Amino acid sequence: MTILFMGTPDFAVPSLEALIAAGHTICGVFTQPDKPKGRGHKLQPPPVKELALRHNIPVFQPVNLRGEDTQREIQAWGADVIVVVAYGKLLPKAVLDAPRLGCVNVHGSLLPKYRGAAPIQWTVLNGDKTAGVTTMFMAEGMDTGDMLLKAETPVGEEETSGQLFDRLKDLGAQLLIETLEKLEQGALTPIPQEEAQATHAPMLSKELSLVDWTKPCLLYTSPSPRDISGSR
């Protein structure tokens, strides 16, 4: 299967690694532009870019996907599927319609719960005892597409949010490979999301983004500063 991959942070790395290991043809990788970090404010590449370059995969870092030239370039790849994992940008309709089999997203929650940019962090904030990942076809709304597969996992009593993050990114990679296999076989039945059950997981405020990855997740039962962070 020929795949165009879109992803940026650590959460997306295992998914790209799994696609490479499974023998899929990765025709290109789209990721966010390099950003200044550290005391010297030197430009640092996203983790997905570093992985792609190690495997000699072409990398593209447009500011957005709205430009006609960028959209024509994406269409010209002729990918069977566009896989999106924590890319950080919405895909316009011209991009969503480009691949033969659609755009498949790996999301770090059991949709329709926790749509948005920080599903794992809000899982921890709310003291949930169960977490998971969902694969879905992408639509124009924020995480509103039809669901394909889910994988659920309990949150361990002594598990830190850092450990949960790492488990879910690996679980997402496994679920992605299973999803693509079944998609290629025509063995998937997309399931629309129940809008009445949808909840949202927006980016965290500064007050809620204090980093402490050493505390057990289940210590937390209500929204307050706790063991959470944005994408690492």
Feature locations, PLM:
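Internal anion-binding site segments
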Residues: E195-S222
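Internal alpha/beta domain cores that form substrate/cofactor-binding pockets in large enzymes
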Residues: C27-G28, P58-W77, L90-V106
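N-terminal glycine-/serine-/threonine-rich beta1-alpha1-beta2 phosphate-ribose binding loop
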Residues: P36-D80
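Single conserved hydrophobic/aromatic residue that forms the stacking wall/gate
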Residues: P223-R232
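Glycine/Thr-rich phosphate-binding loops of Rossmann-like dinucleotide-binding domains
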Residues: P14, K37, P92-K93, S231
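Donor/substrate-binding cores of folate-linked one-carbon enzymes
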Residues: A22, V81-H200
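N-terminal Rossmann-like dinucleotide-binding module
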Residues: M1-G40
